[in-house]
Every structure is written in structure tokens, then in C-alpha cells.
Amino acid sequence: MRRITCLTREDETDCEPEDVLRRIETAKKSAHSVIKEIRKSRDVKRTLKVHMEPWGDLCLHEYRWNLKRVVLSPFRISKGRKIWVYYEGLRRKNISVPEPVFFLEIKVLFVVIRTYIATRWIAEGTKLSQLAAKKDIRPDHFRTILCKCVNAVINLHESGFVHGDLKWSNLLIVPGKDAVVFTDIDALRKTSDPLSQCKDFARIFRPPSRCRLDSGTAEMMILQYLSGRSSLGDPLLEKRLRFYIARQKSRRNDQFL
């Protein structure tokens, strides 16, 4: 038996779940663009830019079931629901992520087979990877942006979260705002484990193709992170952090000067 759960954040959009699902299917057919698509055996993740009334332009994330995951952990919370649940806690901690406007989950018996979560489209933001690729960006200006990114990660970790995929393309810089927006947050999880947080931070030291991170700037970022993380005063933790960063560096030797 199929059961649909739909949650919205605005009173004026109190819609029936079946109606929201119909709107989703219509929006998918006329999507503005496919931002990301991952297809594995019995597992699909898609991110689309769509337009849906009354919300306007949205970033729609679709997750379809994975048989292996269902068998291993049938009662595990879905990625979409996790984003929905975490949002208010993140907002209270001044951690910027795209604002979710609705969440829809389809279950057959007790098994989640499909999840949708829609977030507001951020039109004015630029990915860190796109900024790094600009030839006319001043080095001192880019270092300032990197410092903002490190501060955002410090706040995320001090609040007891790890992002799970801190690629440069998942850090959105919004002009005129101090906040750095974390995107693609379906790997986000709660943990205060310092080793997990060190691994999370180390991922930012693996820049994308054709981008460069000089050793002086990298060291500045490391010291800034350690200074902002009072819980990482243990020299052994600093050693582990540098080990994780060196491992990321070895995967992209040509990206470090």
C-alpha cells in the first residue's frame, strides 16, 4: 500500500500530498536544467532547476530507493527527510544552507521508495570553484574568500555537524553577504567526533581541475581552522589533520604549488 507524506513550511501552501506529487511530476517534465544526476543500480539521485507555483524557481532533489540500503537498514531516515529535520537547527546556528520549502516522501508498506525535497533557488550565488577559475580575480581577494569559507566550516563543526562532501563546487559565495552557503548537503550528519571533522575539513584542500592552491595559502587556512577550533588543542589531532590534508594533496599533486 502506497503512502505519501508531504510537509511544507508556509501556511498558504497547505496542499494535498497527491496534488504536490502531480505538480512535481509536471515540473520535472519541463525542468529548466539538470544540475546533477547520479544513476546506480536501483539508485537514482537527481537535482533539477524547476519552476513550481506558488514557490517560484526551486532546486528539486529527487532520491529513489536503493535495494541494498533498504535490506541493510530498512528503517533508516531518508536523505531528504534528514535535510528537512536538520534545517531549523542549522539556521539557529547561523549555518547557511538552501532553505527547504517542501518535503515529500513515498512509502510502500514501511519502505521509502522515493523522496523529494525542494529548496529555494539562489540566483545570485557563485560557486567557489567558479570563482577560482576566473583569470581576473585578485589573489588577495580570493584568499579573503577562502578565509570566509574556513570560518563557515569552523562554525559548522563547532555546531556538531560535518558536511560530508566539502568540494569547492559545494561552497556558494553570495555577493554582499558574509555567509558562505553549503550546498549539496545530503551527506550532512551530526557528529562532534574531531577525527571525522578533520577529515571533513581536509576535503577542501583538494581543489578541482585547473584550480590552484599555493602552499602559503593552504598553511594559512590550516592555522585559521586550528585557531578557531578550541577542541583541537591536542597536538595529536593537529597531526592527524595534517595527515588527512596531505592525503588529499597526494591525490591531486598538480593542484598544489
Residue ranges and their predicted role:
Residues 139, 143-150:
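Conserved short alpha-helix within the protein kinase catalytic core
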Residues 127-137:
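AlphaC helix of the protein kinase catalytic domain
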Residues 77-78, 143, 212:
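Residue-level marker of alpha-helix boundaries and capping positions
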Residues 158-168:
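Catalytic-loop of the protein kinase fold
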Residues 170-182:
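Conserved protein kinase catalytic/activation segment
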Residues 25-126, 148, 154, 158:
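Conserved ATP-binding subdomain of kinase catalytic cores across diverse folds
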Residues 181-257:
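C-lobe/activation-segment region of protein kinase-like
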Residues 1-37, 244:
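Juxta-kinase regulatory segment immediately upstream of eukaryotic protein kinase catalytic domains
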